[in-house]
Amino acid sequence: MTLAKHWKYGKDEDIVVTQLRGLVASNPYVNLIPSEKVVFNPHSDTSKKITIISGGGAGHEPMHGGFVGENLLDAAVSGSVFASPSTKQIMAAIKTKSNKEKGTIIVIKNYTGDILHFGLVAERAKSEGYKVELVIVSDDVAVGREQNKMVGRRGLAGTAFIHKILGSASATSPDVDLKSLSDLGHAINKNLVTLGASLDRTSVPGKLEEEIEFTGNDEMELGLGIHNEPGTKIKPIPNIDELIQKMYHQLLSPEDKDRHYVDFDFENDEYVLLINNIGGTSSFELYAIAEHALANLPLKRKPKRVYVSDFVTSFNSPGFSITLLNLSNLKKEDISFTDEDVLKFLDTPTNAPGWKPKIYDSEIWNSQNKEIESPMKNETLTSSDLKIDGQKFESQLVNALKVLLDEEPKITRYDTVVGDGDCGQTLADGANSILKALKEDDDFKSNLNDPVYTLGKITEYVEDSMGGTSGGLYSIFLTALVKQLKQTKEISVQSVGDALYHALYDGLFKYTRARVGGRTLIDTLQPFVDALHKTGDLTKAVEAANKGCEETKNLRASFGRASYVNEEEFKAEGGIPDPGAVGVLALIKGFTEKL
């Protein structure tokens, strides 16, 4: 039996304590009681404020220890992986930070073990003279009332909101009493809804793979719990918009009586949106998911705040959750705080490392129009008095691009072996953008007889559509070529050869050290330019380009990611030519065969 893939730790090591020590080592604002797994803020003056304590099983980091800090938690206690801490541990947290006069609020998620252990400690603490109130977070909508009627909704990412709101309220409202603050916590919880979606179960360090029922290919789970509790399996995996629409329906639809927990006025209600990384979703995808979540919101008003980060996780679970807090409903609650107070508490700065969103004031949040037009949009391209046969040039250009597209599968196959596999697609993106422009851009098509203007437009399309190193090289070379053509008095094979020569040697070579022999696109481009400049003979120039490309089969890469590939890979199939060199050769052959 093999272990799920994780780093290996000492056989007898308590990895929970180890990670808490790492947290404390990186955060000088907190201290640790390692024997009890309690992280606490020694700087918070609990003689003047109500103490906010939380805790639960490990594996949901940054919850709970990562939320200890100014204007957030005063202490957090961790159990073992996915297991509630003991009553002894919880009592240690209370005795470390609680003040008998001001009182303590304990925030926990709605799981049986947490309720039993924290509830028992709350009663024990009361018997010793402490004032203690429990706020139990239950924001999940995945499980309906009928199924959870004995235990209630699970606590998920909405817990982070309650931590932040109660922590800030306690720190900034020294005169608030314990009941008023706990009432705020209950009111927030009452108006929270959360639903998660995951591509797979989480892999727990030290747990055998055979003990985890992973999802199948092209399968996901909606409502998968943060302890691997089964959700509803969906196959095939839907498009992200379709998935998010389904999630919003489950979060908000009043038609689903079994799962409709919070009323929303779709036209008028104010709310806060939180997109939570359950652990294994990249930041890249998480922000993309957030944009789709915003685009598909069925609520008319924009959210008052948008938070995107990892708040409540489940190790490396490749999923996300959506949380909505209805602010407008708070006006109907019998509490001492307003919805504006709640936003103020969310905006209060904190040094807790787990609360990663930057803090902005209300004025900044209210300035919603964040997208502007590019200053490049209306730039006027340079035109010239040079003239060519525009119709013939278009025919040559289209042929060159089509030859390149025909070669794309081969280029991609070569680059998959000796590079990172993106060269073919990058070139295809550039080719397709130019072909599209020839159909849709009237200015481009009507000025094909002006080589300066035309190459300027082609450079624009290349810059916009081609990323990576090859995109940069093509863009610089074409920009330099435009500059040279502006200084040319007439178009001929020789004058174009001279312009290409100076664009290469005085332009592109200023920004790259790649030369013939380095196994790059230069191995095709440089021989072609040199031969055309020297002889003015297009046939000889094409032959030189072909020879240069062929010789890359025997070269070891010196530049780019290919320089890290084992030499044996280059010798496969009798030698693999450089993909970039093949691409340039395709363009040269395609363009010149129509002359």
Stretches found by the model and what they are:
Residues 1-595:
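N-terminal loops that bind phosphate or other acidic moieties
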